[in-house]
Amino acid sequence: MNKKIFHILVVDDDDRIRELVKEYLVENNFLVTTAKDAMDAKKKLEIVKFDILILDIMMPGEDGLSLTKEIKKNNPIPIILLTAKGETHDRIEGLELGADDYLGKPFE
């Protein structure tokens, strides 16, 4: 029996965070693609069907919250927001815009 390998898109403008998350996920048998910003993510979402999106909120250009709202209009993909914004109202805003979960930075 073949086990499904989940394909995850990690979007973060910080190269170090992007690579750290990718490395962890690959070590745990996930297929990972990365994007450096919202525009890069949109291009990849047009051509690949991902199972999960891990998305930083604070990025130059379009931020993760507006990207979440845009994606969720037409795509039921689960979105996990990844950010240093840890206030309760920040979490609520992200979840109200369609995010499925929220992971605060820094993380171990």
Predicted features by range, described:
Residues 29-36, 44:
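Short hydrophobic/Thr-rich beta-strand motif most characteristic of the beta2 strand and flanking loop
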Residues 19-27:
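Charged docking surfaces used in two-component/phosphorelay signaling
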Residues 18, 60, 87, 105:
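The feature encodes the CheY-like receiver
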Residues 48-54, 59:
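Active-site beta3 strand of CheY-like receiver
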Residues 43, 62-76:
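Short amphipathic alpha-helix used as the core "switch/output" element in two-component signaling
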Residues 37, 63-66, 90:
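Acidic catalytic/metal-coordinating carboxylates
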